[in-house]
């Protein structure tokens, strides 16, 4: 499935074999991606109806309560997401979550924007800048390995404005595995 324009959770990305250890106990999640768990499972946050908590001219705040054992995750998780456009015309997205039990969480949002205003053109001439100095390494099945890779000197070094088409077609293992920039870019 495509995850276009949605909030992704409880856990964005893949969890190998749909299971993980938490406090020494094996937690088995639903499997929805070739035996793995992807983006919160079959009924992840992307398929939920969020409640509007606040709606102002420049701010929207949404909330969702995910009950204990939802997609087999431990703990009831209360989450809010805020979207704010500030005076500099920047979109700020903020996540806040609280669980009543130890659990795992990795939230993201999959909003997409046309950066140059031409809907008939692909993204290769778009310029992007991402304040990220590392990525989470993935294997050929797109499963995170637990390692972090430095982006310096790679096609994933997007810390300065870069035309997407300049880097995305380079022969680089992580881009090849993901078939593009479908990677977790992080700043540590």
Which residues does each PLM region occupy?
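Short strand-coil-strand connectors
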Residues: 23-25, 100, 131
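Acidic, contiguous internal or C-terminal segments within carbohydrate-active enzymes
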Residues: 68-117
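Active-site loop/turn microenvironments that scaffold catalytic and metal-binding pockets
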Residues: 1-45, 143-157, 177
